[in-house]
A protein has these predicted regions:
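Alpha-helical and His/Cys-centered functional microenvironments
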Residues: 7, 16, 131
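Intrinsically disordered, low-complexity repeat segments enriched in small/polar residues
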Residues: 7-8, 29
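Sequence-pattern detector for short linear motifs
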Residues: 8-9, 148
Length: 154
C-alpha cells in the first residue's frame, strides 16, 4: 500500500513537471526575445537553409521528413508530393507555419534545437528519431540555431 502511494506521488510530481515545462515554453514563445531587437523567424532563410536539413539523410538515422510527415509529434511537416525531392512553394509556406510550433524566436531552448541534439551536447534525451546532431558545431544544427535566432539571407 505504501509503495502504491509513493508511485502515485511520483506520477503526480512527474505530471506537474511536464505541465509546467509546457507552460513555460508557451510563455517564452509569447514573449519577445531578450535581445536588442526581438528575433523574428524568416521565411526565405527557412526555405533555403532549414528545409534542406529536414531532407538530409544522416548515417544511422532516417531523414526528418520520413517520420515528421506521418507522426503526430509537435513538429509535423507536409508530405512531399509523389516523385518530388523537395517541397513546392505552397508546401514550404505550410512547413514554415508548422515549424513555428517548435521554434520560438530567439529562444535557444526551442524544441527545434534541443530535441534532435545529442544529450551530451546539451540536447534532450527524448527524440524517437535518435540524436541527429552529435554536436552544437554541426553545420546543419547551426542552420537551425541561426533560424531560431532570426537570421536572414543576405
Amino acid at each position: 500500500m505504501h509503495q502504491m502511494k509513493r508511485a502515485s506521488a511520483y506520477m503526480l510530481v512527474g505530471a506537474c513537471v511536464f505541465l509546467a515545462a509546457g507552460g513555460s515554453l508557451k510563455q517564452a514563445q509569447s514573449q519577445p526575445a531578450a535581445s536588442s531587437g526581438a528575433a523574428k523567424l524568416d521565411y526565405a532563410f527557412f526555405k533555403a537553409k532549414v528545409e534542406p536539413v529536414f531532407l538530409t539523410k544522416r548515417p544511422g538515422h532516417a531523414r526528418c521528413v520520413v517520420c515528421h510527415t506521418i507522426n503526430n509529434a509537435p513538429l509535423h511537416l507536409v508530405p512531399l508530393s509523389p516523385g518530388s525531392a523537395s517541397w513546392n512553394e505552397e508546401q514550404s509556406r505550410q512547413n514554415f507555419e508548422l515549424v513555428q510550433r517548435v521554434a520560438a524566436p530567439g529562444l535557444l531552448e526551442s524544441p527545434l534545437l534541443k530535441h534532435p541534439l545529442a544529450q551530451e551536447a546539451g540536447g534532450d534525451p527524448h527524440h524517437g528519431g535518435g540524436q541527429q546532431f552529435s554536436s552544437q558545431a554541426d553545420p546543419e544544427w547551426l542552420a537551425l540555431k541561426a533560424f531560431v535566432l532570426g537570421a536572414t539571407l543576405k
